[in-house]
Regions:
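Bateman (tandem CBS) regulatory domains
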Residues: 38-52, 109-122
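Short beta->alpha transition motifs characteristic of CBS
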Residues: 73, 86-103, 156-172
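The conserved cystathionine-beta-synthase
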Residues: 54-73, 79, 100, 123-146, ...
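Short gly/pro-enriched beta-turn/loop segments at secondary-structure junctions
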Residues: 7, 37-40, 47-50, 70-73, ...
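Short alpha-helices
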Residues: 1-19
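Internal, active-site/partner-interface "lid" segment
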Residues: 16-46
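C-terminal non-catalytic interaction/assembly regions of soluble proteins
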Residues: 107, 111, 135-136
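Terminal peptide-recognition signature
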Residues: 10, 45, 68, 85, ...
Length: 172
């Protein structure tokens, strides 16, 4: 452990002398703790779409509750029935709680996903660095973000990244 501490100290001195940033260090030492944290991509941590069932704009409140309860991400993604995997909305457990609070219980039987979903949620791509996704979640003070849909270049839903996964990976 003493040798490791001396090695770390020498690495820090070398970084400062060379004017290297943490990112430069991470690129040169991807297997180290710092390197791993700074080079992880969203694709390394996201839950892929083939593990998540889509719902549709006309899905009932009962279907939304069932899917959010069945899954392990606290949300469900919404798409058009006629389109491939184009994301048109997202319903989180928070959206669900707000809907139950704001709508008259008599309306619950007729509520559909389109009425409670977040239209145009903030999305990311799988090639984004995970640390950048975390920064995006943290900087949104207006409405806390605990998960981000992941899309490809064709705007198709390919997965979801949870704050929980980022924290488990040591990004906090």
């Amino acid at each position: 452990t003493v040798a490791m501490a001396i090695g770390d100290a020498l690495a820090v001195v070398w970084m400062e002398k060379r004017g290297l940033s943490k990112k430069d260090f991470a690129i040169n030492h991807p297997a180290g703790t710092l390197g791993r944290k700074l080079t992880l991509k969203v694709s390394d941590l996201m839950k892929p779409s083939n593990q998540l069932n889509p719902l549709f704009k006309d899905s009932s409140l009962r279907e939304v509750i069932s899917e959010i309860t069945r899954g392990s991400i606290g949300s469900c993604w919404i798409k058009e029935r006629s389109q491939d995997n184009k994301l048109i909305g997202l319903i989180t457990d928070g959206d669900l709680r707000r809907a139950l609070k704001n709508y008259d219980p008599k309306k619950w039987e007729t509520l559909v996903a389109e009425e409670i979903m977040t239209n145009d949620p903030i999305v990311i791509t799988s090639d984004l660095f995970a640390i950048e996704a975390l920064e995006l979640m943290e900087k949104n003070k207006k409405k806390p973000i605990s998960l981000l849909p992941v899309i490809d270049k064709d705007n198709e839903f390919i997965g979801i990244l949870r704050l929980h996964d980022l924290i488990q990976a040591g990004l906090n």
